[in-house]
Amino acid sequence: MPFMTERPLTPREFLDECIAFKRERLTGGRFLAALVQGNVTAAQLRLWAKDMYHFVQPGIPALTAWLAHAPTAVERESARLIARNLAGELGYLREPDHRDLYLKLLDEGFGISEAEAKEHLPLAGTIGATTALCAFCRSSFAEGLGAFGLALEMQVPGRPNGAAVLYEALRRLGLSESALEFYRIHVEAEEEHGENAERAVAPFIQTREQQALVRHAFRWTVIALAGMQQGFDAYLS
């Protein structure tokens, strides 16, 4: 699909295009496959967990900045849907702040303090994915929909829920239910957040130009996320 189509796609056509792109490009890597199979060492797991700290922690401030761009004078349903996602991430709906849950995972699951995680220098792919996601969320509401809403949170039909896969893999490796609360609550949250993003995007992809803007943010973020996943392979050596 070109950067800008000859005619505007319907919202369903646009989402189907995004799903196909995400299915093709975001396939994981050798490290994540080894983690799921239980073939990683404790040291390798600790490196991965510390890397992910640098992806998880900036995400919620980026989501807050994204919501601040929402144009509510003409259409406010999209802002309401994304605000619900933000409320969940910040711990105002059911579970605690997701950043705090990740710190609990580090502490209880790996014996890693936040100070130690901060000292860890993340891989280039992790830096790239974090930077791309945060940049688009701070650029415009439409680009945030492409990056955070569709590239990160939209589910690919027929593909296992990513949080569920990691939850089960880490549970088999011996992590406690308490430590794994971060991934357990994301099993349900990812589905809801992805559906909210799909519903929110429709008013912002009515023209070819709008679709090109969202497509650009979506594709770049998917490629950056793929680079992060494949970058973890360095921890296998």
Regions from the PLM with identified roles:
Residues 2-237:
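Non-heme di-metal
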